[in-house]
Amino acid sequence: MKRTYQPSVTRRKRTHGFRVRMKTAGGAAVIRARRAKGRVRLGVQ
C-alpha cells in the first residue's frame, strides 16, 4: 500500500505558503496569530 504523504516542495508552497495565506482574510488571520505568538516561521519556506 502506498503511503499517504508523498512530499513535494511545489505543492507544499502552493497550498501552505506565505503568499497563499495572505490572499484570504482567514489566511491573513493565521499569519497575524503566528506573529502574535512569536513564531519564527510564519508560513512554509
From Swiss-Prot:
GO terms for molecular function: structural constituent of ribosome. Disulfide bonds: none annotated. One of its GO terms (cellular component) is ribonucleoprotein complex. It comes from the Bacteria. InterPro entries: Ribosomal_bL34, Ribosomal_bL34_CS. Keywords: Ribonucleoprotein, Ribosomal protein. GO terms for biological process: translation. Pfam families: Ribosomal_L34. HAMAP family: Ribosomal_bL34 (MF_00391). NCBIfam families: rpmH_bact. Belongs to the bacterial ribosomal protein bL34 family. This is Large ribosomal subunit protein bL34. It comes from Nitrosospira multiformis (strain ATCC 25196 / NCIMB 11849 / C 71).
